[in-house]
Amino acid sequence: MALLFDSACIAIGEQTLYQGFTWQDLELPQWCDDIYFTGNVRRAIAHQSPSLVHRLIELIDHHAVHFALVPAEAPLCLLLPEIKERQSVAEVLKAVQQKLPTSTEHERTLFCYPYGSASFLVALKRIAQLANSPYGCWVVALDSSEVFCSGIEHQSFEETKTDSLLLARTVDTGTGLAFSPVQIDLHSQAYASGSDSVMPSLASLCKQELTDLCLPLKGEESEQWQNHLPRFSPWITQQTRYHFNQLNSGELGTGGGLLNALVLYEQQKQAPNAHFHALQLDCDPLGMAAGVLYRWRSEE
């Protein structure tokens, strides 16, 4: 199995990037200093929202034209920030369904993954199964920041906070990304971070040099994965490339995992490397961590 990744749109703040995007196309974030927060932001909606769930629904309305790109018959996986209340998940899911094209002859297959930054990798096995459909599997990642919600104390931050929606199509083809079993774990009393379990598991699966590493930069999480890099000796070399995509995009949250896969796919498609072997780790502080190894499979 090898997955083709086709980015339909990447909406970050007020800007939407389409196929063939580069980071040079992304406009600089806006500096904001008001009664709510101080920092760089990329907002699609200028006002503060009552809650994160309410803001997600507002973003769905804002991006209605992009949801219309999904064929009525295509299966879809919806990736969301960590939302523990079932009713809140149901409200977001209903808002998405109202924007999607419908068919009287076909009921859409739709799965929801409200697991934050790890959502894409948690969903990856299901995405691969659905990618066999005639329309492929479509993936929507939607997220925002709680600093865009009223009722919080004023705070300052260094990371760029974003409203974001990523929409991509995946197809099971003879050429594309092939992936190892996804490793998943939660923060617990036994582990300071889910990464403390996921990284050793990935190290045990790694049997060849790593050409690329896609890793998060989130405070203590960075320290956690750094502590485990020696486990990958001798597979990490001076030629290994490190990808910290959020430095360009800002905090995408749920969309970060999908973006990592899109970046790796586009890189390999444009500049093929016969030895391509990549590691992707997505995690949230005190939340879920997920990791995977990719190879490039070609039918040629």
Name each model-derived stretch.
Residues 1-135, 141-144, 152-300:
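Conserved "HGTGT" condensation-loop signature of ketosynthase/thiolase-family condensing enzymes
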